[in-house]
Structures are given as structure tokens and as C-alpha cells.
Amino acid sequence: MAKKIISFASDFGLQDGSVGVVKGVISRIDKDILVNDISHQIPPQDIKYGSLLLMRAIQYIPQGVLLAVVDPGVGTDRKAIAITTDWGVMIGPDNGLLNLACATVGGAQKAYALENENWIIPHEGNTFHARDIFAPFAAGYASGELKLEEFGPELDLEDLKQYLIPLTDITDDEIKGEVLYIDEFGNCQTNISPQELTDKDYKVGDVIPIKIDNQELSAKWCETYKNETIGGIGIVIDSWGMASLFLSNGNAQKLLNCKDNSKVII
């Protein structure tokens, strides 16, 4: 396992220096650690968005250490944790942020609380655990200076917080799902799988009736983001294998005025 790589994701943005400070802490512990930035533009405090992003990214980033911080409960009694998997070690807050990524690589094996005082940076405030706790533990482990058993007490996996992807509700007549994720282009990924569409006898090229919240429309099932019905909504199976609503040369989210959790009925 390539332990000298830390992949880092957060909702910090790039304006106030938080990302640079965290990476600086890592470099001070071991300047040879490579930090791979996944994203720092996760919407603020959006654990759902962050967990979905990590679930997708974990399949393609190098094995080693994942440092992920979307932490609206920072400074409260929520635990700072490390989870071991076949992929490597995932470090972050115990708020459900990490569990989809863990499940994607075969599930959690062990979990530890980050409580070793020797690896916690002394601090006056209690609002920057990425700098004071997560980064030192991630760097210590990646460098080989800190063993997992030295992190702190082992935790019961069943006690860890979970975020679960909502399941579709399928009846004889309908597939009831929702919008999971909206990307930068306004494409709206749903929790509806291609198998669920084909089980209803839909196929590529079909025009499918859809209801989004209170809007009724039709969308053509396309193989790519090119829809010959210019200005029309299409359905494509996106790069993550889910049915996604798109607008050719446009922004489906703005046209439909939908959002995360918008109800989608086919």
C-alpha cells in the first residue's frame, strides 16, 4: 500500500487559506508526503454531497490515506475517527461522511478514535480539527511514525454514524426516486438505476414520462449528453452508472428548478 499519499477533500473552499494550512501541517510532519486534492468545493456543511463525492472518487484515487472534512459538528462531542479498509485508512469526523466510501471498497474493518494527545496540536479554539487533529494523525500514519493502534481506543463499528443512499420505491406502475446530486453543468443525478428503467421495458431512444416535484414532462433516453431534441430534457446513464437528467447545451437544474432531494417519478 502506498502509505505516503494522502488524498484530501473538504468544504473549505480556496479563499481563506484553510486548505493550505492543513497541507502545511502535513508537510511539517513529513515533507515527502504527496497530497492529492480531490475537491475543496463541497458545498458548506453538506455531508450528503461530500459522502457521494468520496464514494465516487475512492474507486480512482491511489490507495493510502483519505483525509475528508465536512464537519458541521466540529467542537461538539462527535468523534474524530480513523477507519481501516482494504483500500487504506480513512480519517475524518464521525458524521456519516466516510461510510459510503468505506462500503465501496469492501467495508470498514476497524475504527479508532483520534485521542492520542501526542498527535494533537495544542489550540485555543475548538473549531479547526482538520488542522489540529485530522491532519497530524493522517500525516503521522502516512509517514510511518504513528501506528493505528496508537491512534486511540478502538471503536465499535456499529456505533459509527451512517449516511445511506435513499432507495427507490417501485410499484407496478411507477419508479419513485429522487435527485441525489447536481453537478456543475446542472445535470441532475437520480437514485434510479438503468436496470430499474429496463425492468419497466424502457430502452435507449424511448421518450419517458417523468414527474419532478409538481412538474410533468417527457425525457428521451439518450446514450450521450447530445439530445437531438434541442432544448429538451434527456435522460443519460452517467459516468457513475445512474440515470441523470440533462439539457443539451443547457442547465437542467435551472430549467426544472429542482434541487437535491427533489422527487422524481417515472
Enumerate the language-model features and the residues they cover:
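Fold-independent oxyanion-binding glycine-rich loops
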Residues: 10-12, 38, 69-72, 85-86, ...
